[in-house]
């Protein structure tokens, strides 16, 4: 009886194709970043042309973004969504701030947190996320549907500048809508934090108002509006880019919405943090005194 040894498996062969495939991934990422930046610059650069030629479309987009359509209009549109998000964010700042400051016996400074944290970080991030989740995602889906149904190609055939007509108008509409929305958002954030601190935790209204008005500065509010305007530009250009370049049918449109939302949520925080560091990094612009 003879026993034959099992044949050893052939050694894995090095594949240059797989190496080149992995090496192309960073290149594709850099190419997409370049295309996105160029699209954003083109959309922003064609704003004056869009305001002259497509002002009716711009007004329609302002109305649609402000109050929404269909079921969203029933609950108050984007304004209601922004209000609910900022109310929750302001209440969380009050709850966490009062509990944390209470551990070291300075819960009276909760009004200081409302004047500082809400204006510089919480309200811009919450408003940007609400804008991305409502207006931005809708813009991506709408432009993506137009791309796969060849409506954007039809605009180009009719000698209509598709980027100006579709993207620039939405960027301007987002800027117009975000200013009153952010005014509402920051007001509700202040109100929710005061109600939570005074009525639920029982802090004196005079103590809260003293520290709130002491540390609330008008230039901080102005910089906060500048932050949220920059956030709106980034959010709208990002979502318009993914919708404009969508491909692959309805599945591709859904994937474009998901990618745009993920990138928007990241860029919102990055923009707010970098802006806050640029404005307050060298001088915090407040003196903490009891």
What are these regions (language model features)?
Residues 143-168, 249-253:
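Short cytoplasmic-facing helical segments at TM-TM junctions of multi-pass membrane proteins
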Residues 70, 74, 122, 126, ...:
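Selective transmembrane-helix segments that form parts of the transport pathway or gating/packing helices
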Residues 243, 266, 270-287:
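Membrane-helix cytosolic exit motif
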Residues 87-119, 184-229, 238-259, 282-290:
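Membrane-interfacial helix-loop-helix connectors in multipass membrane proteins
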Residues 49-59, 63-78, 265:
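Membrane-interface helix starts
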Residues 106-153:
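Hydrophobic alpha-helical transmembrane segments of multi-pass membrane transport proteins
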Residues 72-91, 268-278:
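Hydrophobic alpha-helical transmembrane segments of multi-pass membrane transport/permease proteins
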Residues 8-60, 242-247:
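Short, membrane-interfacial amphipathic segments enriched in basic
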């Amino acid at each position: 009886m003879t026993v034959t040894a099992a044949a050893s498996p052939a050694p894995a062969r090095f594949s240059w194709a797989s190496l080149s495939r992995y090496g192309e991934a960073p290149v594709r990422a850099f190419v997409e970043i370049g295309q996105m930046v160029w699209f954003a610059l083109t959309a922003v650069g064609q704003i004056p042309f869009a305001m002259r030629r497509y002002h009716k479309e711009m007004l329609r987009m302002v109305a649609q973004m402000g109050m929404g359509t269909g079921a969203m209009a029933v609950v108050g549109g984007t304004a209601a969504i922004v209000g609910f998000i900022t109310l929750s964010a302001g209440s969380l700042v009050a709850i966490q701030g009062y509990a944390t400051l209470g551990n070291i016996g300075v819960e009276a400074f909760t009004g200081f947190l409302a004047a500082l944290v809400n204006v510089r970080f919480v309200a811009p991030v919450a408003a940007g996320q609400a804008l991305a989740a409502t207006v931005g995602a809708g813009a991506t889906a709408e432009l993506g549907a137009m791309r796969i149904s060849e409506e954007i190609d039809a605009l180009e055939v009719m000698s209509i500048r598709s980027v100006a007509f579709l993207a620039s108008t939405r960027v301007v509409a987002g800027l117009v809508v975000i200013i009153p929305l952010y005014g509402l958002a920051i007001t509700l954030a202040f109100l929710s934090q005061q109600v939570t601190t005074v009525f639920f935790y029982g802090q004196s209204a005079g103590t809260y108002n003293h520290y709130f008005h002491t540390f609330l500065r008008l230039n901080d509010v102005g910089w906060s509006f500048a932050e949220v305007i920059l956030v709106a530009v980034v959010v709208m250009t990002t979502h318009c880019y993914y919708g404009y370049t969508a491909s692959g049918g309805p599945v591709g449109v859904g994937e474009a919405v998901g990618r745009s939302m993920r990138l928007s949520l990241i860029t919102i925080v990055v923009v707010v943090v970098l802006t806050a560091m640029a404005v307050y990094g060298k001088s915090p612009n407040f003196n903490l005194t009891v």
